[in-house]
Amino acid sequence: MHALAKWVPGDHLGLDIPADADALRDGGTAFLTEAFRRAGALGADNAVVNLELAEFRGGSTGRKAQLTVSYGKPCDLPGELFVKFSRDFDDPGRDLGRSQMALEVRFALLTRTPGFPIAVPRCLFADFHDGSGTGLLVTDRIQYGCNGIEPKYHKCTDHSMPDPLGHYRAVFTALACLAGTHKAGDRSGRDFSVDMRRLSVG
């Protein structure tokens, strides 16, 4: 993908996806409406009618943004959203890890399955273009520190957690639920083979 070509076709849902926040702004409510419909999150009789997008820096790869939207009709979709781009055109080091989102997108799409065994942020859209490593993920925004969700902890600061044992018990319990569901044959793991080279940032 040329640096100026900020839209690429998604491999899963067949919709052209924006590679960065500027392209998403250009796509505006029309893109979000079609994207949410294509992912099965938004009905054909509803639409995204307004959006506000604010980028922030976080994590080790790609770019992130907070997205606030409103809908034409009342619905159960969240309005406070999180956006993750696999690409970072301003930082080659962060852009190097762009292929990591391939499996993340597949997992996000899988979470839309009725009866998915663990609680995760609701996925409104996810797609990835393998040829360029360009991906887009739009989910419900986690409200840390409220409604039973732990506060946001910085990486590598487990010593500051009030209950690290309880934290990791919850993490491994969720992983066990996923593994058990997979082994029971209700979810396919064929799309989640591990390639450590693709998971490496540097």
Predicted region positions:
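Non-catalytic, well-ordered alpha-helical scaffold segments
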Residues: 62, 136, 169-173
